[in-house]
Amino acid sequence: MNKNLTEIVFLLDRSGSMSGLESDTIGGFNAMIEKQKKAPGEALVSTILFDNVSEVIHDRVNIRDIKPMTDREYCVRGCTALLDAIGGAIHHIGNVHKYAREEDVPAHTLFVITTDGMENASRRYDSARVKQMIEHEKSKYGWEFLFLGANIDAVETAKHFGISEDRAVNYHSDSVGTRLNYEVVSCAITSMRSGAPMSADWKAPIEADYKTRKGEKD
């Protein structure tokens, strides 16, 4: 196992409900990647954009070779096949690790799942299957999963998928909330790449913003 290597998998919602947040999503993602390029250690990045279908724009690319995402890749459309995106990504990464040489298997694997709506279009995977897959990878290999959700109960949704409450957070699906997500996720990635356990308060800035502005909107 390569203790200096981290596997990072981003699953980003680009369904029609993300309309208007394209530039914030692209800008936040690119800023996070640039920051991570300067962090110590090696990292492989996979990025899956999902709507009705999943599109892989990075497949285990060295983080230092990632080019900025543009609106050619991130263009919103369609519905939300969230379960298919998660299930397909776990299956792919799991197979790669299974057949890799021991010294090539990353010591740390992190999935970051961001969505602003309910699952409504998956055909290959259901929540029971995805939950089984996530729980297997967590218990056997120590994979981490972060779930960031807007316009849904993110904590309850994550539970259905086998992701614990302390790894799920609600956020505001707007410019401020979207950019804050990437800042906070970047800090969590830095911690994981250093070999430190995921902090219990990794999501505190997002929670604070959500609660403060939820009160204002209510």
Regions flagged by a language model, labelled:
Residues 1-218:
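Acidic, low-complexity intrinsically disordered regions
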